[in-house]
Amino acid sequence: MKLRQKFISVLVFFMASLLVGLSGLFLYLNPQIPDASTYQNVQIETPLRVLGQNGLLLAEFGERRSIPITLNEVPQHFIDAIINTEDKRFYEHRGIDFISLSNDLLSLVGDLITDRGLGSGASTITMQLARNISFNLERRFLRKFKEMLLALKIERELTKNEILTLYINLVPFGKRAYGAEAAAKTYYGKSLD
């Protein structure tokens, strides 16, 4: 009986400490998180395009190749592929997928014990969007919590379709191509549709 009481006392202390720690972390990080409403009308950076008299592209200047598109212009199979590879439960969570997060934490503990390195990131589409819009890409512990807080704010203020549209237009695909349309033109020389 004493062992059980001791276990319950330790568990209550641990849970209270965790709650106080998370509350303190929230109070510290929340003022650093931008307001999610600023992303409703985000301006997508497009390069300067020089066209010839015949209308063909001669040159492109700028750090990013971006061609903004609407969600209606994106083929459904591409949307399905993004959701299935990046965030299977995209329509079921509110910015943070706690199932994937807990699985990733267990995987991380296992990887640290066996010294295999770090596991996957457990980032949802909304968290990836938050990272690509607001935070630098350095791997820091606090950045992940900032992503989570901003993802929660984004999910409160934007619809899932608005989030997907921003993600499909802003995610880097390599070779300076930002967004799915720019990636299709960069890698395949044609439009998404």
Model-assigned labels for residue ranges:
Residues 1-193:
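Juxtamembrane regions of bacterial inner-membrane/periplasmic proteins
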